[in-house]
Amino acid sequence: HHDPIIEKPSDWKQLKQPEVEYDDVKTNRLYEAAGDALGDILEPKLVGVTNFSFHMMHWYCDYRGLNNMMMDLIDEPNMVHETIRFFTEGVKSMLKQYEDLNLISLNNDDTFFYTGGLGYTDELPAVGFNPDGVRLCDVWAAAEAQEFSSISPAMHEEFILSYEREILKPFGLTG
């Protein structure tokens, strides 16, 4: 049983869009401390964001519960659309902040990729790559909605796939 955090449509209004903060001084201090502590054993590597996996229907279920989500698709479809749109806009805003703050690192190497493998590919980074400013088109991303395994293809398209495609569009590869 799941007691929903969000009980009525107006409760969603309490959520705020993500705001990315980065403290360069603190990050470098921690990086240097790790190097001092581990430098003889292994070399720390300073990287930015490498994991781009999006689970908006899972987030919805975290707030409403799986049973309520299933009922909402029929009883409150506008609430579902408004919420997934809110999540979509939040993710897009967060991604822009990552790019603006230069916080993205390549993930076409031994970085674990959400779908269960490693990111190795020679298709990334994209043409025009600049190592001083990794772009979304230079990296992998993924999205999923396992909660929709029992939902019709039409509802899957309507309630989540169209939003996921919007988020994944700027990425170099998706899986």
PLM feature segments, named:
Residues 1-17:
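Well-ordered mid-protein domain cores that form the structural environment of catalytic cofactors
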Residues 18-175:
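Active-site loop segments of alpha/beta catalytic cores
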